[in-house]
Structures are given as structure tokens and as C-alpha cells.
């Protein structure tokens, strides 16, 4: 019993410490940052799904979309030449050194590809949806390189909440007036992504 009581107290202390740290890390505005979810459908078919960092997360989103009967194509190395008749670009953010290696591209090359693709999409009036669905496992130096540039150009964002415990994506969306829906897991994508399409 004593051991159990000590464990509970140590966990409670860790919980308090984490809460204090998040307040210190977030600064003055982050704790007050409010972001609304998507109020009405903004996207149109067909969609082009690509990776932002070459993790396999984009393939999981494609599987969900296929099961929902959504009209889309996937291309993990898409450039402006691949936009075709796409009316929506979905960029699934998550860095993977293994995925980058398999694609024959480094992080800087991936950032340049995404910048070129997203600028072309913006110029063509294509709706951009940023997704971060890998949770906490898809955070860290590599993945974080891709989050800011992708979210800054997005029209809408979907985030698995465990991947945004520091509020980075929420803050980016608030700063850019981008609607963002937080979900508990990748399986919850079905409750928000199809509803984004007209």
C-alpha cells in the first residue's frame, strides 16, 4: 500500500510539473489561444494526397479516404506538375528519415518540394488541408521542420491531439485564422475529413 501511495503521489507531482512547464513554454498568449473547427465545407473533389516529410501517415489517410468512397489520388513526391485537375491538396505531415531515404530526398529537398507544390496550389485556387495524424510519435526535430511551412499555407487543419500537446499547431492555426479540428486518433478522421468536402 505504501508503494502504491508513493507511486500515486509521484505521478501527481509529475502531472503538476508538466502543467507548470506547459504554462512556461506556451508564453502569455498560448494558453488563451482559441481555434475553431471547420464551420462549413470548403473542399472539392478530386483531391490529391501527398506526404509532408515522407512518413507513411499519408498512406493511412488514403486508406481511410478509400473506405469512405472519396475521390482522390496519392503521390508522395507530388509537384505542381502533378496537381492536374485537383481541387483540394491534402498534405499529411510527418517526418521519417527512412521514408526520405527511400524517396531519395533529404529534408531540405522535401521542404523545397512542398513549398513549390503548395505555392502552385494557392495560385491555382486549390484548397489546402494540412493533417498531422501521427500523434506524439510524429513530433521532434525532423517532423517539426515540416509543420510550420505546411500549416502556414493551409486553409484547414486536422490534428490528432496527442501530437499537439505543446500547442504548436493550434498556435499556427490561430495566428493564420485557419480552422482546426482536433481528433483523438487517426480513426476519427472519418468524422471530420469527409465533412470538409462540398
Q: Where are these predicted regions, by residue range?
A:
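Short acidic-hydrophobic, aromatic-tinged amphipathic segments that line or gate anion-handling sites
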Residues: 160, 179-185
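Ser/Thr/Gly-rich flexible loops in soluble cytosolic domains mediating phosphotransfer, phosphorylation
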Residues: 110-144, 186-198
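C-terminal motif of bacterial Sec signal peptides marking the signal peptidase cleavage site
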Residues: 9-13
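Short, charged N-terminal beta->alpha structural module
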Residues: 42-67
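A short, well-structured beta->alpha microelement
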Residues: 65-85
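Structural recognition of alpha->loop->beta junctions
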Residues: 140-171
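A short, gly/pro- and small-residue-rich
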Residues: 101-125, 172-180
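N-terminal, intrinsically disordered, polar/charged segments of Gram-positive cell-envelope systems
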Residues: 17-40
